[in-house]
């Protein structure tokens, strides 16, 4: 089966002041040490907001745009940290992520909705592989990037755990996802992750 991807991922490309081309935001762009350490949730939320604002004419008001580039994205990142503010344990579930995301939208005068899937390895509550596939396929086909919380890597050699990233594409049969994380992209085997991640995680999509 063909890869399912958001239609214009290049809208999430930013050139930093030193000339580095990044895909999606990077928490290192924050100014303070605490923000740099803990800001993955607000960055993932910023990716969702930015993409919606730049692909839907009626959602332009979700963020202020001067030149549509790095500086504008930084303004959004800083604002988002005030709505999705990490505590000592970070933003460790969708319940700490979604309310701030929607509150930000309301403050901008736009009513948005969120769909989310908590992934826990507990009997009777753990989503199956098909649940995750269906969730990702549904929202990527609707041209919505998906925020992904990885609480533990399982057998995958991912750069970080207890960490929010953004899913841009999925190959549904192999369950290989294309992920934006700290300005770079890589692939991750979501099927392997679901089967081996001890702490699970969450998926969140923002939509009208």
Segments and roles (model prediction):
Residues 2-13, 72-208:
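Conserved active-site-adjacent core of cysteine acyl-enzyme catalytic domains
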Residues 1-97:
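Active-site-adjacent structural segments surrounding the nucleophilic cysteine of cysteine proteases
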């Amino acid at each position: 089966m063909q890869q399912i991807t958001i239609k214009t991922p290049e809208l999430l490309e930013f050139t930093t002041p030193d000339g580095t081309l990044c895909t999606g935001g990077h928490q290192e762009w924050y100014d303070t040490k605490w923000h740099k350490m803990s800001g993955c949730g607000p960055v993932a939320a910023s990716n969702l907001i930015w993409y919606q604002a730049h692909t839907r004419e009626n959602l332009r008001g979700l963020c202020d745009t001067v030149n549509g580039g790095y500086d504008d994205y930084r303004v959004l990142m800083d604002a988002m940290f005030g709505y999705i503010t990490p505590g000592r344990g970070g933003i460790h579930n969708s319940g700490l992520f979604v309310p701030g995301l929607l509150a930000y939208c309301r403050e901008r005068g736009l009513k948005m909705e969120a769909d989310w899937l908590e992934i826990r390895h507990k009997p009777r509550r753990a989503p199956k592989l098909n649940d995750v596939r269906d969730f990702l396929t549904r929202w990527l086909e609707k041209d919505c990037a998906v925020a992904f919380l990885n609480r533990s890597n399982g057998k995958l050699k991912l750069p970080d755990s207890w960490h929010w990233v953004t899913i841009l594409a999925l190959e549904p049969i192999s369950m290989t996802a294309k992920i934006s994380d700290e300005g770079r992209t890589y692939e991750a085997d979501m099927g392997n992750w679901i089967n081996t991640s001890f702490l699970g995680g969450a998926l969140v999509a923002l939509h009208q």
